[in-house]
Amino acid sequence: MQALITISDKQYLVKQGDKLFVPRQQAAIGDKLTIASLAQIDGANTTLQNSNSVQAVVLEHVKDEKVIVFKKKRRKRYQSRNGHRQQMTHIEVLSL
C-alpha cells in the first residue's frame, strides 16, 4: 500500500520503510513526525479512505548538493559566482 503525503508544499508517494529527503523540518533527530495523508493507494491503483496519517522518524539533517549561480555581463569585466546548499531532513516512513 502507498500513501500520498504533502510536506512543505511538495507531494511524495511513499510506502512503509521508504527513506526520503524533504525540506528542513523543525524536529530533533529521533523525533517522530505525524504527517497527514492525502490519499491511500492500493496495489491496483484504487484510492482508499484518506483519513489516515503517516508516521515518520527523523534520521538526520543534511545539506543538499551545491547549486552554482553564475552571473556575467559581457565586455564589462563583471562576473559573480555564488553557491547555495539547501538544508534537508532525512526521514524514514514507519507506518501508514
Swiss-Prot record:
Listed transmembrane segments: none
A GO cellular-component term linked to this record: ribonucleoprotein complex
Tree of life domain: Bacteria
Gene Ontology terms describing biological process: translation
Keyword tags: Ribonucleoprotein, Ribosomal protein, RNA-binding, rRNA-binding
InterPro entries: bL21-like, bL21-like_sf, Ribosomal_bL21, Ribosomal_bL21_CS
Nuclease recorded as keyword: no
GO molecular function terms listed in the Swiss-Prot or TrEMBL record: rRNA binding; structural constituent of ribosome
Family to which the UniProt record says this protein belongs: Belongs to the bacterial ribosomal protein bL21 family.
Described purpose of this protein according to its UniProt entry: This protein binds to 23S rRNA in the presence of protein L20.
Quaternary context: Part of the 50S ribosomal subunit. Contacts protein L20.
Protein name: Large ribosomal subunit protein bL21
Gene: rplU
